[in-house]
Amino acid sequence: MKTTFHLKYDSRWGEELCLTGNAEELGFWKPENALPMRYVDNGYWSVDVELNDAETIEYKYIIKENGHIRWEMCENRCWNGNKSVWDVFDAENMEKMVGVAVPLFSLRSESDFGIGEYPDLMNLADWCVVNKLKIIQLLPINDTAAHFDWHDSYPYNAISAFALNPIYLNLQDLGVEVDEVFNEEQNQLNALPFVDYPNVLKTKWKYLKTAFAQQWEKLQKSDEFNSFFAENEDWLVPYAEFCARRDVNNTTDVKRWSEHAGEGCPEFYYFLQFHCDRQLREAVNYLHSNGLLLKGDLPIGVNPQGVDVYSHPDLFNCNAQAGAPPDDFAEEGQNWGFPTYNWAAMEQDNFAWWRRRLQVMARYFDAYRIDHILGFFRIWEIPKGVKSGLLGHFNPALPLAKDEIEAFGFQFNAEKHMTGKLETLFVSDSYQKDRFHPRIALQKTDLYKALDEEQKAVIDRLYEDFFYHRHNEFWKQSALSKLPALIGATQMIACGEDLGMIPATVPEVMQQLGIKSLEVERMPKVFGRDIVQTEDVPTNCVFTTGTHDMPTLRAWLIEKGENPTSESIKTVIERILYSPACWNIFPIQDLLDTDESNWSADPKDDQINVPANPENHWKYRLKLSIEELIQQYFCEIK
C-alpha cells in the first residue's frame, strides 16, 4: 500500500530529514538505510513508501547533519494504515519560550496619539529584552472602520482580512506638522485612562488626509510604493475602492450605495496601506534584530458588510451567522454576526482566499493564533434574523431524521417539541428541513423538565451521542480537508485556540498537523479538574494564565474568594513556567500585577473583552508608558 509521510519541520541549512522504522521498507531502524525525505514547501518534507498494511509498523524521523544523526525523543510512532500521514517533529526539541500578550491599542508611549501605534512595538521589544521575553502576541490588527464609532474598536470584525488598520499609524513618522493644536489634541487623548477609539480615529483621520494631500503626488512615483502596490494589488485595489465608496455613501451597506455618489478617492487608501506596511515592517525588523517573534491573530470571521464578502460573495453563507454554543462566560451562547464560510466553494481553488490571507500575514508575523480553531471542524451556525445562540446548530453536521430520533425511544412530536422559540427541544437544520438537531442545553428548558423520567433518560442519551460521539470522525475529516492547505501556505508557526466544547478528534488533528494547542490554567480539559495540572500539559502548546476574553488573574482570584498578593500571582505564573509547555505567553496585565504598585483600583477595568456583552468597548490601555515600564518595572519571575 503506497503511503505518503508528511513532516512539518523548519530545517536548518545542511539538515537532511529521513524516515526509519521496524520494517524492511523503512530500513529496520538503521540510519544508513533510512529513507531520505524531500523538501516540499513551507516547512514540509515528504516521502512515499510501499507498506504492508497487515503488519504493525512503528517508525521515527531522524535528522542527518555533517555525519551526525539526531533521533526524535518521543516514543515510536505507529502507522495507522492511512495513505497520507501528517506529523510534526518531536516537540521536545523545541526551545522553551516565554512571551507577552497585549493588544496593540493598549500600548502607551510618549509619542503616540491616544492609542498604541506600530512603532510602539519597538519600545515593547526593548521591555521584552529587559525581561528576557521572546514572543509578542497581538490581537488582530486589520482595518475595522465600518461605522467610525465604538463598534470599530472590535478587532475581530474587520472590513478586510488583508488590510492593516490605519488607526495605528504614527503621525509624526508621516511628517505631520506638530503644532500647538496637534499637541493639545494629543495630550487630551493621552491623558485618558482608556482608548477613546472614536475620537482617536476621527482626529487621526484629519491629519492623515492632510498628509495624503501633501505627499501623494510624490509618493505614487516612488519605487518603494510601486513595489508595494505590485506585491499587494490583488487585495489592495478592491479594498481601496470599497473604502472610497463607503466614504461617499457613508455606509458599508452596499445595498444603500448610490450610483450617483461617485467613486471617491481610492488612492487615499493606497497611501494609508503603504505606510501601515512600512511602519509595521520596520517594527518587525527591529523585533527580529532583538531575537523576538511576533505572533498575530487569525480571526474566524469577517464583517458581513466588508470588502471580502462584497468581492467574493460565493465564498460566504450570508444567510447564517457564526457564533459559539453556551459556556461559563455566555449562558446563551454567542452570536458574532459573521457570515459562515462556504467551504465547498472555497475548496474548488484549494482555499486560495485563505492561503493568500495567510501569505499577507506572513509579511509581518512569525506565528499566529487560529481564532476558534474548532470552526475549521464545525462552526456554530445561527439562522439570520435569530439573536440567541441557543437556537444555533453545528455546520457541517449530521442532523437527525425523525425515525432516528424515535429509534432512540423518544416520542417525537414536532408540534409539541419544536416551538421555534427558546423553549424547544429540537431545532430544524438550515439546509434539510426534515432533519433536526437537539437544542443545545435543552436540559434547562421547561419542556425537558416536564418529561417523565424515562423520556428524560432517552433524550439525555440522544443528546450525549449527538454532541459527543456521532460527529467525531465526520468533523475530523472536515478539518483535514481544510487545515493542511492553510498550515502549509506559509512558514508561520500555527497555534490553535482550542477552548470550549471540544470534539474528541480536535487534539488528534492538531497533533497530527503540528498545531500548538492552548492551555489556560483556569480552563482544564481533563474532567474533574479545577485548574490545569502541569502533568496534563502537552509539550507542543501555549500555556497561559488567561486570555483577552477573561478576567485577569488577579480579578479571577478575587472572584474565587481569595485575597491575591503580588506573591500569589507570581506563584501561579512560576508554576506555569515550570510546566512541559514549550511556549508560555502571559497577558501583560498578569505580568504587571506581580508588582502591587501597578495594580488598578478595580481589576475588572483590566479585562479587555466581556464575551457576553456584544456592545463591549475594546478600550483597555496601560497605565504607564512603555518607556516608564522599562525604567521602573523589571519582571521578577524566575
Which residues make up each language-model segment?
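Catalytic cores of glycan-processing enzymes that make or break glycosidic bonds
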Residues: 48, 78-638
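Extreme N-terminal starter segment of soluble prokaryotic enzymes
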Residues: 1-4, 97-98
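Aromatic-rich carbohydrate-binding modules that target alpha-glucans
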Residues: 2, 10-55, 64-85, 113
